[in-house]
Structure formats: C-alpha cells, structure tokens
UniProtKB/Swiss-Prot annotation:
InterPro entries: YjaA
Top-level taxonomic group: Bacteria
A single GO BP: cellular response to hydrogen peroxide
Gene: yjaA
Organism: Escherichia coli (strain K12)
Taxonomic classification: Bacteria, Pseudomonadati, Pseudomonadota, Gammaproteobacteria, Enterobacterales
Protein known as: Uncharacterized protein YjaA
Length: 127
C-alpha cells in the first residue's frame, strides 16, 4: 500500500511517497489572492503529473486491480482560521481527479507546518 503526502502552497504542489521516500514538486498558476486553488483544472493537472512521476502507469495497469493509496493533504498556506467546506471540497475533488479516485483514506491537514512522515502515518491510523 502506498502512502502519499501532498503539500499545497501558493502555485506549488509537492508530493512525497512515504514508502519509497521519493518526492516531486511542480509549479503552476492555480492560486489567486483569495484561494489556494482558484484554477481547479490547472491544480488537478499538476497533481496528476506528479503522481504519475511517482507511480507511472503502464499497459499492464489496465489489467490489474487498482492499487489504492492512503493520502494526506496539507494546505500549508492561506489556511488562517481553518478551511471552509468549499475549500476542503476543492482539495478532495482535485485529489480524486488526479488519482482517478484510487485511494482508501483521505485526510486534510490545514496548518502551516509540514508534517513528518511519522505524523502522516499517525494521522492515517486515527481514521
């Protein structure tokens, strides 16, 4: 089972695979002055490309059962006062689209501090 930790900042997404310890980052203009993710499709494409760098698809993947991931997303900026339901939904939908909904667990962390690998695992164990 793969665990992905996704960190979202203004116009930047970083994805870390806790199993392989690999990390990739991408930049694009998806934020504005009010929303961390203002351009949904741009953010989804950046995240999809990053996930594919960590977990490339092959022809064989279409014949095998889907590998489900556990995902924690950190909104590291523009999170003062917590996230609204709309902002949480945006994060959920971006991840769902980028991963083709291939996840078992999904958690949102809305604080400015980056989580350690052990903190991510602890969050997933809480369910």
């Amino acid at each position: 089972m793969s665990v992905l930790y996704i960190q979202i900042r203004r116009n930047q997404i970083t994805v870390r695979d806790l199993e392989s310890k690999r990390e990739v980052s991408g930049d694009a203009a998806f934020s504005n002055q009010r929303l961390l993710i203002a351009n949904f499709f741009v953010a989804e494409k950046v995240l999809q490309d990053l996930v594919l760098q960590l977990h490339p698809r092959s022809t064989w993947h279409s014949f095998l059962p889907a590998k489900r991931m556990d995902i924690v997303v950190s909104a590291l900026e523009m999170n003062e006062g917590g996230l609204s339901q709309v902002e949480e939904r945006i994060l959920h939908e971006v991840v769902a689209g980028a991963t083709l909904m291939k996840y078992r667990q999904f958690h949102i962390h809305a604080q400015s501090a980056v989580l350690s690998d052990s903190a991510v695992m602890a969050m997933l164990k809480q369910k």
